[in-house]
């Protein structure tokens, strides 16, 4: 989601979820993780992202009994059911008829809406065999996300999360996208707090039990600078070098945090 801090927008109150809401969010987190397990099996050379998108729509609606939240979201209305960001696309890549090819890397970002709640997660997938450089970017980006998640606990700050993500990425020689960030989630697709993937320890909002938000660092192989294409959605690296992203939904608990979007198939984050 767009980083509103850059634009000086007024930040609204953060929701502390009730036990009943938390249980629903666990259900939705499991659903979106199941959908990512499902769609990953189809990521192979020759398939188009449009074909993947149709599979996502069918799975969310006909198998899971929900609805793809990205479809018709925002302004201009997003035209598809998921985001498919290939190679130098940072985020919000719109599915199209171009076949994936051997060596591509792709982020698939899914959000399901059901019973008034949302589940949101994304993963990186490799198309056939990829270069060691591409695999390293994918691995470091996952490590960056997990470092951010490890910083989540009652009394920690948003700056602690951002610092942890940034530290991993920059120590590996990569850059962190600053214009887009994680977000609160629940009955709303996007709400407070905004989770920056860069920052200073001890700064920003203090975390409380019952908060639910995404941590989803976008890490570039080259410089952090980006541009948005004329479709109003697709975000690409300005230098056309590779970008990677992982996303999990996290609940702040009294004892630390709980990842709500772990893969049911592998049991891994």
Regions of interest found by a model, annotated:
Residues 2-269:
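Active-site neighborhoods and metal-handling regions in enzymes and metal-associated proteins
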